[in-house]
C-alpha cells in the first residue's frame, strides 16, 4: 500500500513530508476500525459552547462538526467527500481511501485535489469537458462532494475566459444538475462555506456569459437546470423564453417566462445574444445554505443581456398557489448575497402567478418571487378591519359634531377647556389617520404606486403618532391635575405645550424617518404602504414612541386609581360604592382613550402570524374615543338640553 501512495505523491509533486504523514495516516486507519455510528457525537453535551467532531464514514475524507443545543448534539457542518482526481477519472481509487485524523492534512489535500481535478480535466477533455460527468454523477450527494463540485465549476468558469461552445455548456450543466437535485437540498445546510450556493449561481452565470452560439438557438435541458439562448436582431418584434420544470419528482411542472418588448429591443444597436437559465430548486438551496427566513415561490431565472436593455418582463407561476400570502418580485443582489425587492416591481398578481418588471444590471442578473412570510390575509380579518374602521370613523365624526355643538357649554372652566381640547384633537387626528389608512390600503397590493405610497405612509405615520402624542398630552394633563394646581400656569402656555406635544413631536419623528430611509428606498415595505422593517427598521420610529407612551399612560391610570381610592377611604359604604364606580369609569374611559389597547397593535407587529391579535386590535380600535363621549355625564346633559 505504501508504494502506491508514494507513486501518487510523485504524480502530484507533493512535498515529501506530506507524503510521509499521508502514509502514516493510512497505516493507522488500517490498524483501527470502529463500528460506531458516524452521524452521532460521542462527547458529553453540556451547553458550554465546545463543539464535537466525528470522523466520516469509510471511504470518505473530512469530518462532521456538532454543536450542543438544548442538551442534544446537532450537526452543524460536514466536509465528508469521496470525490477526488481518481474517483472522478476512474483511476485507482485506493490512492484516495486514506482516513486521516489530522484536519490540517485533510484541508491541504482537499485543495490540492481541486487543483488536480481541474488540471486533469484540461488535459483529458478540454474540448467538451465530458470526461468528468460520469464520475460526478455516480458520486453520493454528500455535503463535501457538493462543495468539491461547486469549487470545480467555479474553477472552470474562471479558467475558460472565452469561446465556450455548446458542448462545454452541456457538460457544465450536467455537473451542476447533479448538485442541484432536489434530493440534495438538505445537505446544502451542512456545507462549511455558507456562500457555496451563491458561488454556484455566480459561476453558472459567468460561464454562460462566455457562450458563443454558432446556431441561432441553443436549448440545453436537464431536470434541474435549463438553458435557452438565441441571437436577436434590433428590429425583432419582441422575444420570449418559456421554461417548464418540476421542483421534484412528484410535483407538477412550474413555468417561468422571460419577455423582451419591441420597445426595449429598439435600444440595442445591432444583433446580440440573449441567454436565460432556469433553476427550479436553486431558490430552496439558497434558503437552506444561507439559513434565510425567506421562501422562494417560483423558478429562479438568470439572464444574460446587453447593457442597453434596462427593463425586462418576467412571469412566474407560483409553486405554492395560495391566495392568503402575497408574492414579491425580487432580484438577487450579487454583492450582498440576498434577495432585493428594489430590483423589480410587481405588475400583476393572482393566486397562480405573478408578473414582474425587473431592471437587470451587473448587480442583478437573477430573479424570482418570494412568498411574503409576514403578510397575513384573511377575509374575516379584512371584514373586521373595515367594519371597525367604519365604526371608528362614524364615532369620531359624531364625537367632533357633539364637541362643536356643546363647546361653549362644556369649556367654561380652564380644566374643562383643556380636557375637551385634547378630546377634540385626539378625535381629529384619529379620524385623519383612519382616512389615510384606507387610502394606503388601496395603494397597497401587487402593484405599489411608489410616490403615492410614500405620501400615504408618511401621513398614516404622522397622524397615528399624533394620536399617541395627544393621548400622552391628555395623560400628562390628568397627571398634572392630580398633582399640581392648574392655575399655576397661564392657559395660553398650557395650550401651546399641548399642541407642541400633540403635533410637533410626531411631525419631527415622521420627517426624520422619511429623510433617513427613503433615499435608499428603505422607507416602505415591499408588499404594503407601511414602514419598512426588514431592511431599515423604519417601523421602530412608530413602535418605540407608541410603546413608551403606552407605558406612561399605564402609570397615569395607576396613579388615578390610587388617588380615587384614597378619596374613598374613611367614607360611608355608599360613598365607597360611588368611589368604586368612579374608578371603573376612569378605567373604562382611559383605557381606550390613552392608547392601552394599542398594546395589541404592537403585539401584531411582534407576532404578525397571530390572527387573534389582529382581530382583537381591530375590534378595540373601533372603540377609540367614542366611550369617552358616551360616559361623560356633563356632555350628555348638554346634548340633552340642546336637543330638548
Curated annotation (Swiss-Prot):
Primary subcellular site in the record, as a coarse category: membrane
Gene Ontology molecular function terms on file: G protein-coupled receptor activity
Membrane topology qualifier: Multi-pass membrane protein
Tissue: Mainly expressed in skin and heart, and very weakly in lung and spleen. Detected in all epidermal layers of skin.
Keywords, in A-Z order: Disulfide bond, Glycoprotein, Membrane, Signal, Transmembrane, Transmembrane helix
Transmembrane domains' residue ranges: 387-407, 423-443, 466-486, 494-514, 542-562, 586-606, 611-631
Cell compartment(s), UniProt: Membrane
GO terms, biological process: cell surface receptor signaling pathway
Glycosylation sites: 155, 219, 293, 311
Something else known: Most adhesion GPCRs undergo autoproteolysis at the GPS domain. ADGRF2 is not autoproteolyzed at the GPS motif because of the lack of a consensus catalytic triad sequence within GPS region of the GAIN-B domain.
Disulfide bonds: 329-356, 344-358
GO cellular component: membrane
Protein name: Adhesion G-protein coupled receptor F2
Disruption-associated phenotype: No visible phenotype.
Domain of life: Eukaryota
Domain GAIN-B: 233-377
Intervals, Extracellular compartment: 19-386, 444-465, 515-541, 607-610
Signal peptide stretch: 1-18
Spans annotated as GPS: 329-377
UniProt lineage: Eukaryota, Metazoa, Chordata, Craniata, Vertebrata
Family: Belongs to the G-protein coupled receptor 2 family. Adhesion G-protein coupled receptor (ADGR) subfamily.
Amino acid at each position: 500500500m505504501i508504494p502506491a501512495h508514494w507513486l501518487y505523491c510523485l504524480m502530484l509533486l507533493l512535498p515529501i513530508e506530506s507524503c510521509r504523514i499521508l502514509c502514516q495516516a493510512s497505516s493507522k486507519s488500517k490498524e483501527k476500525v470502529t463500528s460506531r455510528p458516524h452521524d452521532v457525537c460521542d462527547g458529553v453535551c453540556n451547553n458550554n459552547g465546545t463543539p464535537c467532531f466525528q470522523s466520516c464514514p469509510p471511504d470518505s475524507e473530512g469530518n462532521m462538526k456538532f454543536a450542543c443545543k438544548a442538551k442534544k448534539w446537532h450537526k452543524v457542518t460536514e466536509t465528508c467527500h469521496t470525490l477526488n482526481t481518481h474517483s472522478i477519472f476512474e483511476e485507482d481509487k485506493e490512492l484516495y481511501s486514506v482516513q486521516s485524523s489530522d484536519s490540517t492534512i485533510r484541508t491541504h489535500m482537499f485543495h490540492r485535489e481541486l487543483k488536480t481535478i481541474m488540471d486533469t480535466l484540461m488535459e483529458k477533455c478540454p474540448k467538451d469537458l465530458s470526461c468528468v460527468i460520469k464520475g460526478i454523477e455516480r458520486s453520493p450527494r454528500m455535503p463535501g462532494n457538493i462543495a468539491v463540485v461547486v469549487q470545480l465549476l467555479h474553477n472552470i468558469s474562471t479558467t475558460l475566459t472565452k469561446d465556450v461552445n455548446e458542448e462545454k455548456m452541456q457538460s457544465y450543466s450536467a455537473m451542476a444538475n447533479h448538485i442541484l437535485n432536489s434530493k440534495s437540498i438538505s445537505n446544502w445546510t451542512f456545507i462549511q462555506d455558507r456562500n457555496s450556493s451563491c458561488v454556484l449561481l455566480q459561476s453558472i452565470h459567468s460561464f454562460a456569459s462566455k457562450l458563443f452560439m454558432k446556431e441561432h438557438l441553443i436549448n440545453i435541458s436537464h431536470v434541474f437546470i435549463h438553458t435557452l439562448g438565441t441571437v436577436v436582431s434590433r428590429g425583432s418584434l419582441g422575444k420570449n423564453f418559456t421554461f417548464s420544470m418540476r421542483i421534484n419528482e412528484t410535483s407538477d411542472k412550474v413555468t417561468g417566462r422571460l419577455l423582451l418588448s419591441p420597445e426595449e429591443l429598439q435600444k440595442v444597436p445591432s444583433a446580440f445574444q440573449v441567454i436565460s437559465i432556469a433553476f427550479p430548486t436553486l431558490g430552496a438551496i439558497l434558503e437552506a445554505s444561507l439559513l434565510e427566513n425567506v421562501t422562494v415561490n417560483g423558478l429562479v431565472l438568470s439572464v444574460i443581456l446587453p447593457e442597453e436593455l434596462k427593463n425586462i418582463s418576467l412571469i412566474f407561476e407560483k409553486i405554492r398557489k395560495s391566495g392568503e400570502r402575497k408574492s414579491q418580485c425580487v432580484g438577487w443582489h450579487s454583492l450582498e448575497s440576498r434577495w432585493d425587492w428594489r430590483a423589480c416591481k410587481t405588475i400583476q398578481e393572482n393566486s397562480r402567478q405573478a408578473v414582474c418588471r425587473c431592471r437587470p444590471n451587473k448587480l442583478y442578473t437573477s430573479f424570482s418571487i418570494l412568498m411574503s412570510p409576514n403578510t397575513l390575509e384573511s377575509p374575516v380579518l379584512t371584514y373586521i378591519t373595515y367594519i371597525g374602521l367604519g365604526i371608528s370613523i362614524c364615532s369620531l365624526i359624531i364625537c367632533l359634531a357633539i364637541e362643536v355643538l356643546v363647546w361653549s357649554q362644556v369649556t367654561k372652566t380652564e380644566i374643562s377647556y383643556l380636557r375637551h381640547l385634547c378630546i377634540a384633537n385626539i378625535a381629529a387626528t384619529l379620524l385623519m389617520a383612519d382616512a389615510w389608512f384606507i387610502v394606503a390600503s388601496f395603494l397597497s397590493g401587487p402593484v405599489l404606486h411608489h410616490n403615492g405610497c410614500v405620501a400615504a405612509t408618511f401621513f398614516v405615520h404622522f397622524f397615528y403618532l399624533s394620536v399617541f402624542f395627544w393621548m400622552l398630552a391628555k395623560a400628562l394633563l390628568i397627571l398634572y391635575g392630580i398633582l399640581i394646581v392648574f392655575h399655576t400656569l397661564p392657559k395660553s402656555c398650557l395650550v401651546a405645550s399641548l399642541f407642541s406635544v400633540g403635533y410637533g413631536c410626531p411631525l419631527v419623528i415622521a420627517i426624520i424617518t422619511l429623510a433617513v430611509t427613503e433615499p435608499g428606498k428603505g422607507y416602505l415595505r415591499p408588499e404594503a404602504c407601511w414602514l419598512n422593517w426588514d431592511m431599515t427598521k423604519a417601523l421602530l420610529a412608530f413602535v418605540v414612541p407608541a410603546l413608551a407612551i403606552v407605558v406612561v399612560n399605564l402609570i397615569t391610570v395607576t396613579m388615578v386609581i390610587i388617588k380615587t381610592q384614597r378619596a374613598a377611604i374613611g367614607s360611608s359604604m355608599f360613598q365607597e360604592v360611588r368611589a368604586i364606580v368612579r374608578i371603573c369609569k376612569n378605567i373604562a374611559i382611559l383605557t381606550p382613550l390613552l392608547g392601552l389597547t394599542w398594546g395589541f397593535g404592537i403585539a401584531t407587529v411582534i407576532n404578525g402570524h397571530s390572527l387573534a391579535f389582529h382581530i382583537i386590535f381591530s375590534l378595540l380600535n373601533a372603540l377609540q374615543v367614542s366611550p369617552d363621549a358616551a360616559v361623560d355625564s356633563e356632555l350628555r346633559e348638554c346634548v340633552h338640553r340642546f336637543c330638548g
